């Protein structure tokens, strides 16, 4: 599906998955895997595995992320994170290993397609030379097939370039991703930003967690 607006909540009891090519919104998500190429918006997330290529907004009467492993590539904004019981709650922002791997694979595929296009171009030149110098040996059907194959590869290249550009922009822009916690973040929570980790030793309130080139820092929520 492209986008999904779930009026009620979702609880698959760890046996189901919600996936969308765009945004997902719902009242709550419990014990569910959620994947969205866009944003996710809900009232609370409980014991879920979440991956969004956009942002995650958890706000409302409860407004909490409790338990689970939650990734918002472009950032996470929540009222609260974790619980007084110090339940393990993992938040991740920034590009994932899978996204970087996908980008690297696209670049390799582009190089391969470029090589194939170059081969077809060389073949076209040879056919043109044969047509001019030895017309009796010119194979028009084969020349047409080569030209058509090149056109197909050019179309494939255009799609790969579009996809690789989108991923490149996502990886670049996700460097500025932050975690915003309006009320409380509890011990037991962990925030991962690339190779850096923040683990609150006590309850912190009203903070923004952001990455610098050397470390992770906390800022006031209203900054």
Language-model segments: which ranges?
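Short, small-residue-biased leader/transition segments that mark boundaries at the very start
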Residues: 1-3
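Intrinsically disordered, low-complexity terminal regions
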Residues: 15, 19-26, 33-43, 47-223
């Amino acid at each position: 599906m492209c986008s999904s607006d779930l009026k009620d909540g979702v609880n698959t009891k760890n046996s189901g998955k919600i996936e969308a090519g765009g945004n997902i919104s719902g009242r709550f998500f419990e014990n569910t895997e959620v994947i969205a190429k866009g944003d996710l918006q809900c009232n609370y997330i409980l014991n879920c595995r979440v991956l969004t290529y956009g942002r995650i907004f958890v706000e409302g009467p409860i407004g909490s992320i409790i338990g689970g492993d939650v990734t918002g590539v472009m950032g996470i904004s929540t009222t609260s994170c974790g619980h007084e019981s110090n339940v393990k709650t993992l938040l991740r922002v920034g590009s994932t290993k899978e996204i970087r791997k996908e980008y690297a694979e696209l670049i390799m595929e582009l190089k391969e397609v470029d090589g194939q296009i170059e081969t077809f171009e060389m073949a076209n030149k040879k056919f043109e030379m044969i047509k001019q110098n030895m017309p009796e040996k010119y194979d028009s059907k084969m020349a047409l097939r080569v030209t058509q194959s090149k056109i197909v590869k050019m179309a494939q290249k255009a799609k790969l370039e579009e996809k690789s550009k989108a991923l490149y922009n996502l990886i670049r822009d996700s460097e500025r991703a932050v975690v915003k916690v309006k009320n409380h973040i509890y011990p037991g929570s962990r925030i991962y930003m690339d190779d850096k980790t923040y683990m609150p030793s006590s309850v912190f309130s009203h903070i923004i967690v952001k990455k610098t080139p050397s470390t992770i820092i906390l800022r006031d929520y209203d900054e």
